[in-house]
Amino acid sequence: MRRFLRPGHDPVRERLKRDLFQFNKTVEHGFPHQPSALGYSPSLRILAIGTRSGAIKLYGAPGVEFMGLHRENNAVTQIHLLPGQCQLVTLLDDNSLHLWSLKVKGGASELQEDESFTLRGPPGAAPSATQITVVLPHSSCELLYLGTESGNVFVVQLPAFRALEDRTISSDAVLQRLPEEARHRRVFEMVEALQEHPRDPNQILIGYSRGLVVIWDLQGSRVLYHFLSSQQLENIWWQRDGRLLVSCHSDGSYCQWPMSSEAQQPEPLRSLVPYGPFPCKAITKILWLTTRQGLPFTIFQGGMPRASYGDRHCTSVIHDGQQTAFDFTSRVIDFTVLTEADPAAAFDDPYALVVLAEEELVVIDLQTAGWPPVQLPYLASLHCSAITCSHHVSNIPLKLWERIIAAGSRQNAHFSTMEWPIDGGTSLTPAPPQRDLLLTGHEDGTVRFWDASGVCLRLLYKLSTVRVFLTDTDPNENLSAHGEDEWPPLRKVGSFDPYSDDPRLGIQKIFLCKYSGYLAVAGTAGQVLVLELNDEAAEQAVEQVEADLLQDQEGYRWKGHERLAAHSGPVRFEPGFQPFVLVQCQPPAVVTSLALHSEWRLVAFGTSHGFGLFDHQQRRQVFVKCTLHPSDQLALEGPLSRVKSLKKSLRQSFRRMRRSRVSSRKRRPAGPPGEVQEGSVKAERPGLQNMELAPVQRKIEARSVEDSFTGFVRTLYFADTYLRDSSRHCPSLWAGTNGGTIYAFSLRVPPAERRMDETVRAEQAKEIQLMHRAPVVGILVLDGHSVPLPEPLEVAHDLSKSPDMPGSHQLLVVSEEQFKVFTLPKVSAKLKLKLTALEGSRVRRVSVAHFGSRRAEDYGEHHLAVLTNLGDIQVVSLPLLKPQVRYSCIRREDVSGIASCVFTKYGQGFYLISPSEFERFSLSTKWLVEPRCLVDSAETKNHRPGNGAGPKKAPSRVRNSGTQSDGEEKQPGLVMERALLSDERVLKEIQSTLEGDRGSRNWRSHRAAVGCSLGNGGE
């Protein structure tokens, strides 16, 4: 009975916990997954994007962002922002309409759904009778005109969504008002286009799919003009002055129609097939925009020659003799053009083209010669190459920050200098208190550096490791280059490139030292690169060293992929991070753990075969250690051929079933232990009903060495601690494996004045075997004050107190199943905490975080942030290992999201909710990136962006986020993750990137290795 009862709560501690811990999902970084609709408000200067999962996202100035999620999770097919209002209407693929509003609450705007409506037909009518194809918000903001597949146009009153049946424009009524010769030439079919007259709100244009276009007088209920085309109509555009119509058609042509009072049925002024004369694909949308200079812009989507370029996704711009077909690597969803916002203006004067593709957003500067792209301050295509790992570094020194930005600015010379043109709303969030970096490794061998200081994720710099290796492609190849006489005049735009030249280039581990500027990256084929930040371009040879992890083993044969061939001579590297040494592991298996100690100039690396230590100052190998067990034969087969035998799979399955039956016999059969005990306590002692029950700890069973790859190196950790005796501390390297083994090596690092003359020596000092053989996921040493040891060079830069070396040190080992504290140097067990409460729970990520109090500026505590395979996040105290709070963060079915999670040094975190989006969350009350912004409908912006130094960075972007404290449930409907993760395709797409072979399934995504992260860089 006693073991189920937890001692009474300490009210002081509970109050302090409320000051330290609070769970929030704050913002989603990146590009919306599977976009399906685009909208724009010229008056508010707000862009809207809808997705197939039912989410809508609004973007304005950097830091201004809103998100909403339809309850039905149906695809958004159209978005229309009401003119001059903070309202928008969405159409879903289930034929429902939804009205959303931006309302001010507490001094900030929030996006809320006000009404929903489904158009109903008369009893017995076919579904096509009311299937909406086009939505036209009237300029009065009081009416919606709805074109349907039946050819009828229905009218709905806003904001109540009340159908006005007496105002319906039926196809029969239109037919009766047409001249006799036009009545029999066309079958109406569906409505393809609805447009309001730019100057007269009493006239609307109705375009039918078979080619008939009519101008309808709303007051007189009559046809003013009608136009007949011989081709199927796709879309239509009404010139700003109302004197010209431009229609586009299914054969790749467009026609210009004059609006003349002399003829009720005008003939086309001009009909043109821009990419003819051969058969072309349909032009699905066209804009004809006037300018003060007199020459219009013609911008259209599609129309490419069907035979040769039918697979291209293009949006074309024609102006003043210049024609360019912007070629995208993913399907174009829609586009819009930013023009003069005042509807009474005489000219459109377009200045920017905004194209929404399936995998990215591209903005083109139409004011600058050559029409260069504009750099995005948000909506970055994180998955331009698939993300394979992530690494977060907090509190970057200003000097390093400026050097990274300077290196990145040289890569952005091809971008326009135009200020970001979508600048509606006002961000109310203060500037971030520090500079943070999020580094993402990619399948194509690149590492991207993102400004993660606020909620507006911005690309600073891109590093490519491809130049080091011999590949089939030329790294200097310019994909956007084309000949002057080439036709069609294609130009590649955008950054999305889903194809990798060689999967072995993929980055698996990243470790950045923010004080020295050293960077270590490791890849899929056993390559470990050490790089140094250089402000100037350099041509240099990369020194190559081979690390044979099987040198003492016989009878093993690697069956996986080959190593990457590297350049033997000098290679030119641009300013930025430049590699100077390549350590090639043999066999060339995936690097599973990485650690860098820039003060000692050492880098440690681990694979499924063992680990090694390399001195990157003297360019020599210190030692290698093979960790293979005789049963680890599969570790030599490689990720492409690693398949477990059916016999072994069945044997292990039956073994688990037997264990489950045995353990179930030992428990009471009436349900979970906590529930059973709670019922018995209430029955026996009513007075104890309000006492809290301690969770039942699951029994930890010893694992067989055949259960997993026991030699798989999960984590590496450097520490200056007491390893041999309590009188003298020394540098050390710790390694934890998948079989529950911890290796400790004492290191002799020469002093700085003799560093190049004497060699680093290593000697194995200890080997610890955990009884339950669970994989070791984290190692940490605590000083005499039970505080984690500081980062390398952190004390030298006066950013941390010197560790307490005279006191007794403690070793914390975190396995998948328990936390255990040992005393040093004797390594005797002192404390332990088993992972509790739920059967099958395993530690997946663990990191040390500093939690500051929101009330007392000078008070803070170090704790462990722990993510389990069930998606729960727990905070565990140091050094007493007492659970503090637990939150439900990621769905347990989202294996890929759990695998991609990284923690920060101050209690925040990131994980992938789709291949292109990170969800950001916070566990801290103090370090909370809280986005707030304001959009005012009365504030109509008519200014045009000028050319400056590029987009100005704002500190944050806004999303309404729900707060979840311990024990509370998440607010429904606001998190896009719920919609995305209900789609199995999304989960499989992330999982295919982040989960490789069986041996690296749980560890290929690099966790945050900053500050006191356990295993500093390893898994």
Swiss-Prot record:
Keyword terms: Cell cycle, Cell division, Cytoplasm, Exocytosis, Phosphoprotein, Repeat, WD repeat
Does this entry carry the keyword Cell inner membrane?
no
Q: Per UniProt, what is one Pfam family of this protein?
A: LLGL
Q: Which residues form the signal peptide?
A: none
Question: Where do the WD repeats start and stop?
Answer: 36-69, 76-117, 132-169, 193-227, 233-268, 282-324, 332-366, 388-464, 508-583, 592-653, 713-769, 778-830, 835-888, 902-925
UniProt cross-references to InterPro entries, sorted A to Z: Lethal2_giant (IPR000664), LLGL2 (IPR013577), WD40/YVTN_repeat-like_dom_sf (IPR015943), WD40_repeat_dom_sf (IPR036322), WD40_rpt (IPR001680)
Q: Which domain of life is it from?
A: Eukaryota
Q: Where in the cell is it found?
A: Cytoplasm
Q: Which residues form a coiled coil?
A: none
For whether the record's keyword set contains Cell division, the answer is yes
Xref: SUPFAM superfamilies? WD40 repeat-like
Listed under GO biological process in this entry are:
cell division; cortical actin cytoskeleton organization; establishment of spindle orientation; exocytosis; Golgi to plasma membrane transport; regulation of establishment or maintenance of cell polarity; regulation of Notch signaling pathway
Q: Which GO terms describe its molecular function?
A: GTPase activator activity; myosin II binding
Which regions are flagged for Basic residues bias? 647-669
The record describes its post-translational modification as:
Phosphorylated at Ser-653 by PRKCI. Phosphorylation is enhanced during cell polarization induced by calcium. Phosphorylation may occur during the cell-cell contact-induced cell polarization and may contribute to the segregation of LLGL2 from the PRKCI/aPKC and PARD6B/Par-6 complex.
Which parts of the sequence are annotated with region: Disordered?
Answer: 647-688, 939-975, 992-1019
Residue list for modification Phosphoserine: S653, S965
A single Gene Ontology CC annotation of this entry is: cortical actin cytoskeleton
Quaternary structure annotation from Swiss-Prot or TrEMBL: Interacts with GPSM2/LGN, PRKCI/aPKC and PARD6B/Par-6. The complex is enhanced during mitosis. Interacts with DCAF1.
- Family as reported in the entry's similarity comment: Belongs to the WD repeat L(2)GL family.
Q: What is this protein's function per UniProt?
A: Part of a complex with GPSM2/LGN, PRKCI/aPKC and PARD6B/Par-6, which may ensure the correct organization and orientation of bipolar spindles for normal cell division. This complex plays roles in the initial phase of the establishment of epithelial cell polarity.
- Protein name from the UniProt record: LLGL scribble cell polarity complex component 2
| Gene source species | Pongo abelii (Sumatran orangutan)
